[in-house]
Amino acid sequence: MSLSSSIEWTESTWNPLTGCTKISEGCENCYAERLTRRLQAMGNPNYANGFKLTLHRHVLEYPLRWRKPQTIFVNSMSDLFHKDVPDEFILDTFKIMKQAGWHRFQILTKRSERLLKLNKVISWSPNIWMGVSVENQDCTFRIDHLRTTNAVTKFLSLEPLLGPLPNLDLSGIDWVIVGGESGPKSRPMNPSWVVDIRKQCQAATVPFFFKQWGGQNKKKTGRILDGEIWDEMPIAKEIQGFRKRSLVAGVGFEPTTFGL
C-alpha cells in the first residue's frame, strides 16, 4: 500500500493481491508487470512470487488504519475479479471498504463478467466507485456489464486507448478517464479518438478526465488537450453522514507508507 500515488486520478493505492494474467489487447504491455519485475529485484516481499497471482491477507485491513480520508485505487497491481481469486476474498475486500467508509475506493476490472456474477452478493456502499477498463470497440461489452451493477458511482478507464470508440452509451456512467499507453513498447493513440470521446462526454454531461498522451516519455508528451488540462471529476455521491460516522467508529493511526 502506498500513501502517495503517481496516478493522476487517485491519491493512494492498496494491493491486497498482486499479479495477473493477460486477457485482452490492453494487457499486452502491462505496466504492473514491468513494475513487479523491478519491485521483485528490489527484494519487496510482496513480490517474491513475481507476477504470479498472490493474495496478501495481511494487507486487507490496512485501510482501517488510515485515519485521514483518502481516495484509494484498489489493486493497481492486479485485478480483484481475476478467475483465480476466491469469491470469499473478493467479498471480504468489499466488506473492508464498506467498513472504512471515511475513504473513497476506486476499483477497475477487465473481468466484467465475474463482476456481474457477484454483483448481488457484493456489499456495495456509496464510498465504492466501480469501473471497467475498455481499450477498444471489442471491449465495450464491459460497459454494459458495469451499468447493470448496483455500484453507486460507475466509471470508465479508456486506457490504453487503442482505437476509436464512437457512439459510446454513457447512460448510467458517472465518469470517463482517457489515457494513452506509456512505456518502451507503447502503441500510439490518435488525438482524434480522444477529442471524439470528450465531445461524447460533454454531450452526455459526463465528467471527462484526460490522464496522459503516453508514449515512451509520458512526462514529455504531457496531458494537455486543446490547450487545457481536463481534470473533471464526478460529483461525490457518498452520504457525508455515513463517512463521518465511519471516521468516528474507525480504529487505527495516522496514515503512513506501507509499500506497494
Label each PLM-derived region with a short phrase.
Residues 257-258:
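Short, intrinsically disordered C-terminal tails of secreted or membrane-associated proteins
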Residues 1-18, 22, 39-42, 162, ...:
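Auxiliary Fe-S-binding modules of radical SAM enzymes
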Residues 27, 36, 107-109, 140, ...:
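Intrinsically disordered, low-complexity sequence elements enriched in Ser/Thr/Gly/Pro
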Residues 55-209:
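Conserved AdoMet/S-adenosylmethionine-binding subsite of the radical SAM
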Residues 26, 31, 47, 89-91, ...:
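General N-terminal targeting signals
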Residues 41, 48-51, 95, 118, ...:
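Short, surface-exposed, charged/polar-biased interaction segments
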Residues 1-73, 79:
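N-terminal [4Fe-4S]-dependent radical SAM core
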